[in-house]
Amino acid sequence: MTTAACRKCRDEVIWWAFFINIGQTTYKGVLGVLSGSAALVADAMHSGADVVATLVTMFSVKVSDKKADEKYPFGYGNIQFIASSIVGLILFFGALYLMYESTMQIIAGNTSSPSPFAVLGAIVSIATNELMFRYQSCVGRQNNSPAIIANAWDNRSDALSSVAVLIGIVAAVVGFPIADRLAAIGVGILVAKIGIELNIDAINGLMDTSVENDVLVDAYNIAKDSQHVHGVHYIRGRNVGEDVHLDINIYVDADLKVFESDLVADAIRRKIEAEVDHVRDVHVGVTPVRIAA
């Protein structure tokens, strides 16, 4: 279950990501220029895009907290899927630019061996981004936040990029100068792939793809095992940002009075919302059936 501590982490993690990405953009950019590493400069540009992506995530999480109103009766949660898509697009088009620029430099013959100091920048970047990926992934999963999960994968892409950068820098230092530019292209391929995957996930969320099966099974079992219920006609759900909305129809004895059927449905709704993670809205419909004696 999502605890108060999880919600506190949710409010803090994006600020951590924001300031860390600013720091990484600065130190990798400066170190890349001073050491002559094109791959590290490219990695710094990637971190710069991460700053923008984190701002988008910050905005979307804030807006998604707004209560449902007349204009948006199901709430503002889906803005997190839009934010996830924007993060993915930033990564994808940034990756295309990196690959294009590095390819042009190779064609022009602009390859040189960077200073060994560039290795330090790549190592620090790998460690920092992997830690931020794990931190944000935990917070994103516990809060069921697609925007924070997307931002976590943004950091994982940066960590993978830095691995490619490290390999390229080391290879260039030991006598293969073109490896630095090739590493920058490798960074672009990895980042573009993650950008595409984030957009696919965001589109699935906006298209109301069914929620995880575990959520449906837990809710189904609660409804099925409730008093006066003679079966579950159907159950379906969708993600609305961090929240899960469920629609359930149950079979009850036709001899039950209307208010009694309503009490059964209300008890099921409250039990599901209390016991199933991330479920915030449950609609329980009732279908009367004649029970054979």
Swiss-Prot record:
Subcellular localization, as worded in the UniProt entry: Magnetosome membrane
The cross-references to SUPFAM superfamilies, in alphabetical order and at most eight, read: Cation efflux protein cytoplasmic domain-like, Cation efflux protein transmembrane domain-like
Q: Which family does it belong to?
A: Belongs to the cation diffusion facilitator (CDF) transporter (TC 2.A.4) family.
Q: Which domain of life is it from?
A: Bacteria
PANTHER family according to UniProt: MITOCHONDRIAL METAL TRANSPORTER 1-RELATED
Q: Name one GO biological process term.
A: iron ion transport
Q: What is this protein called?
A: Magnetosome protein MamB
Membrane-crossing ranges are 13-33, 79-99, 106-126, 159-179
Describe its assembly. The isolated C-terminal domain (approximately 213-293) forms homodimers. Forms heterodimers with MamM.
The record comments on the domains as follows: The C-terminal domain (CTD) forms a V-shaped, dimeric metallo-chaperone-like fold and binds 1 metal cation (probably Fe in vivo, structure determined with Zn(2+)) per subunit. The CTD is probably responsible for hetero- and homodimerization.
